[in-house]
């Protein structure tokens, strides 16, 4: 994952210091791009340990359409009350400030992916890939201007587009706001996993993964952590293996396939030969 280190280096060398919504301060670049060939391995960050279980739990939670942090907790920890999630701080701060309770976060990612004005974008985009693979409208958007003010956190990764290329499935996502230290490794692994899942559903091969970033930043309280990442040597890429799906999976309807996907848990997603440097802790800016 040398690309990740190169981005950090670029921000340090060419970024500008600025204030931000959280009051933490950042070093930022506007407009960044990274690309991975998924046929060469899975792009899990290796210069620090990836929070893999949390990453997969969040993706399944998004795909389920849930917007309640306790549902995420159940997927990740098999408990509605025990264990932390990456959305807890957003719930305790922004969601409660909006008047939400009992774990509700408002119409965030899951709501938009599965019910954007009544449209189930996940079902529609996968059906479109199957029926019209050369179509250029294979897009899912989480950015719903009419509902932004009701969200605990407006979507950072706003929309993504699939592309079918000679039997390979590519995905490009656009992210308006990129927390390079904490968020980006999570996002890379999540969208790479989504490519693998949808490729299985559509009988395609995972192809290219492309990240396009808007305000791409390192928070001031993550500067030393990012410098440590630059001192570490990246390890080899690993391989993603997904289990728990039936043999007949590829022959099912999209709706039936998705039912099986939503029954999967983090233990069903294994990174073979994943070797990383030790974790590096950092506080999330909320």
From Swiss-Prot:
PROSITE patterns in UniProt = THYMIDYLATE_SYNTHASE
Could you name the active-site residues?
156 (nucleophile)
- Disulfide bonds, which pairs? none
Gene3D superfamilies on file: Thymidylate synthase/dCMP hydroxymethylase domain
Q: What pathway is this protein a component of?
A: Pyrimidine metabolism; dTTP biosynthesis
GO MF annotations in UniProt: thymidylate synthase activity
* Binding locations of (6R)-5,10-methylene-5,6,7,8-tetrahydrofolate: 179, 285
The UniProt keywords, alphabetically, are: Methyltransferase, Nucleotide biosynthesis, Transferase
User: What biological-process GO terms show up in the record?
Assistant: dTMP biosynthetic process; dTTP biosynthetic process; methylation
Q: Give the superkingdom in one word.
A: Viruses
Q: What family is this?
A: Belongs to the thymidylate synthase family.
Tell me the subunit arrangement: Homodimer.
This protein's name: Thymidylate synthase
Name the gene that codes for it. TD
């Amino acid at each position: 994952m040398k690309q990740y280190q190169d981005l950090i280096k670029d921000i340090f060398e060419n970024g500008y210091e600025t204030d931000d919504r959280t009051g933490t301060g950042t070093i930022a670049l506007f407009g960044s791009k990274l690309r991975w060939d998924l046929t060469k391995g899975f792009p899990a960050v290796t210069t620090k340990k990836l929070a893999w279980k949390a990453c997969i739990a969040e993706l399944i939670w998004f795909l389920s359409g849930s917007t309640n942090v306790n549902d995420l907790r159940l997927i990740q920890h098999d408990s509605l009350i025990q264990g932390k999630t990456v959305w807890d701080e957003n719930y305790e701060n922004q969601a409660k400030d909006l008047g939400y309770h009992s774990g509700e976060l408002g119409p965030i990612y899951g709501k938009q992916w599965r019910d954007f004005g009544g449209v189930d974008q996940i079902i529609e985009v996968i059906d479109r890939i199957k029926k019209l693979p050369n179509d250029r409208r294979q897009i899912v958007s989480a950015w719903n201007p009419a509902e932004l003010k009701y969200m605990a956190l407006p979507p950072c990764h706003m929309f993504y587009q699939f592309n079918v290329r000679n039997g390979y499935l590519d995905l490009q996502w656009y992210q308006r706001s990129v927390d390079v230290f904490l968020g980006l490794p999570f996002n890379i692994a999540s969208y790479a996993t989504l490519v693998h899942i949808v490729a299985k559903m559509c009988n395609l091969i995972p192809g290219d993964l492309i990240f396009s970033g808007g305000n791409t930043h390192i928070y001031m309280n993550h500067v030393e952590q990012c410098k440590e990442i630059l001192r570490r040597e990246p390890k080899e890429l690993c391989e993603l293996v997904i289990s728990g799906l039936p043999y007949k999976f590829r022959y099912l309807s999209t709706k039936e396939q998705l039912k099986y996907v939503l029954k999967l848990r983090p233990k069903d997603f294994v990174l073979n030969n994943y070797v990383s440097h030790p974790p590096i802790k950092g506080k999330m800016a909320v």
